[in-house]
A protein has these predicted regions:
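Extracytoplasmic gate region of multi-pass secondary transporters
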Residues: 36-40, 229-282
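Helix-breaking motifs and short loop linkers at transmembrane-helix boundaries and internal kinks
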Residues: 48, 80, 101-106, 263, ...
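Cytoplasmic helix-loop-helix junction between adjacent transmembrane helices
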Residues: 113-148
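C-terminal ends and interior cores of transmembrane alpha-helices
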Residues: 90-103, 306-318
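Helix-loop-helix hairpin linking two adjacent transmembrane segments in secondary transporters
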Residues: 145-200
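C-terminal transmembrane helical hairpin of 12-TM major facilitator-type secondary transporters
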Residues: 274-283, 289-344
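Core transmembrane helices of Major Facilitator Superfamily
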Residues: 29, 114-126, 330-341
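Paired small-residue
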Residues: 95, 106-114, 321-329
């Protein structure tokens, strides 16, 4: 595009895309997934759910998520990311509203699987927009700000859900699902108003496009490449699998562990979960930006190291101070891996193939999310404690550190 045809405004619309993307992640992952950890104890009491059933409910959500990420890039290409995101968020909102009326394990299982379908069909195109709207040197920061939406959602859920449970009683979780559903619906409307599929729609170049001379272009060879034949995509997928397997065990069961095994009240456990949300607000921007500076490999190794320590601290049942440290270490890196991974994929395959590559790697990530809570729930059922599950998560995080250490530098941006 000729230089005269590209606007360079003082405030780039790409940051509006980041804000809209953050709202989308808040809705589809924050409310659609991470609120579950706060809701499970009261749902389990009312619906008489076992540990293994709690794990399978989380797994069902990830099965839906997994199915949708396989086709999300295809549908984003056909109808556009903006429209797909809107329809997917509507799916999340409606399914969450229906969960509020569930009467047993099977109904929750099926409806929450549909929520997962909507979550995946939102997340993949949202993260794919990062490569379209931002140059390589800005992608980590942009993705980092987008993923903090989950942190805001955790803070809201950590305060709202215990309050409703105290006010309404044992059935308070139903009101929580309904209110969260309404918020997702409002975000869907806001997102469709703000999102655009690419900077060309606004007559703009990507953010930071003029900061390198010349900007790196994937070229015709990369533009026509088959991402499924690139070994690096599978390698990134393996690392992302380990993240999916481990982080979701903590996110799903830490509140249940605090309430059932440590004797915490639901309100106090909610305060702990709210602190995770607050600390996580810094995770994406800080570590995404850090990975722009020190490289994706070093960024991944630092994050997985802190996560491994977090899992070990809660597994060992040490005194309260160590529990606080576990919460801190988990929170400060909570959403770092998705932001680094989205940026890394853009680095390796370029903006044109980014959405498809993110979709495929997220599919592998989803396999980890499916396996983690199911195995952790069954293990806890057999041992009577989640300690073994958290030890397992720490071991898998250690494997992720090792894999990240052998990650090679990308050839394209």
């Amino acid at each position: 595009m000729p230089a005269t045809a590209v606007k360079k405004p003082s405030f780039h619309y790409g940051w509006v895309i980041v804000f809209a993307g953050m709202l989308c992640i808040l809705a589809c992952l924050g409310f659609g997934r991470f609120a579950l950890g706060m809701l499970l104890p009261s749902m389990a009491a009312t619906l008489h759910l076992s540990y293994s059933q709690m794990g399978f409910i989380s797994t069902a959500n990830f099965l839906g998520y997994l199915a949708s990420v396989l086709v999300s890039a295809h549908w984003a290409g056909r109808i556009g990311s903006r429209r797909l995101i809107f329809l997917a968020l509507l799916t999340v909102a409606v399914s969450m509203a229906l969960v509020s009326r569930a009467t047993g394990f099977l109904s929750v299982l099926l409806l929450y699987m549909i929520t997962g379908i909507g979550s995946g069909a939102t997340n993949v195109p949202v993260m794919g927009l990062v490569a379209a709207w931002f140059s390589s040197g800005r992608r980590g920061r942009a993705a980092g700000f987008i993923v903090i939406g989950s942190g805001f959602a955790i803070m809201i859920a950590g305060r709202l859900i215990p309050y409703l449970n105290r006010w309404i009683g044992p059935e308070g979780w139903r009101a929580s699902w309904l209110i969260l559903s309404g918020l997702v619906m409002l975000i869907a409307i806001a997102a469709v108003a703000m999102l655009r599929d690419g900077p060309g729609e606004k007559g703009l170049a990507p953010v930071g496009a003029g900061e390198t001379a010349p900007p790196v272009d994937p070229g015709p060879g990369q533009a026509g490449m088959n991402i499924y034949r690139k070994g690096i995509i599978y390698y990134l997928g393996a690392i992302y699998f380990l993240f999916g397997y481990t982080y979701v065990i903590y996110a799903t069961f830490v509140v249940t562990t605090l309430v059932r095994e440590r004797g915490f009240s639901e309100s106090l456990a909610g305060n702990f979960w709210m602190w995770v949300g607050f600390l996580s607000l810094f995770s994406g921007p800080v570590f995404g930006t850090l990975s722009d500076r020190i490289g994706r490999k070093a960024g991944l190794m630092i994050v997985f190291s802190l996560q491994a320590v977090s899992y070990l601290l809660i597994a060992t049942k040490l005194p309260g101070m160590f529990l606080y440290l576990s919460i801190v270490f988990y929170g400060i890196v909570a959403w770092s891996i998705p932001s680094i991974m989205a940026a890394a994929i853009g680095d390796y395959v370029g903006p044109k193939k980014s959405a498809a590559a993110i979709g495929f790697v997220t599919f592998i990530f989803g396999l980890g999310q499916i396996s983690g809570p199911a195995i952790a729930g069954v293990l806890a059922e057999r041992t009577g404690s989640f300690s073994g599950s958290f030890y397992m998560a720490a071991a898998f995080a250690g494997a992720a550190i090792a894999l990240s250490g052998f990650l090679r530098k990308p050839q394209t941006a």
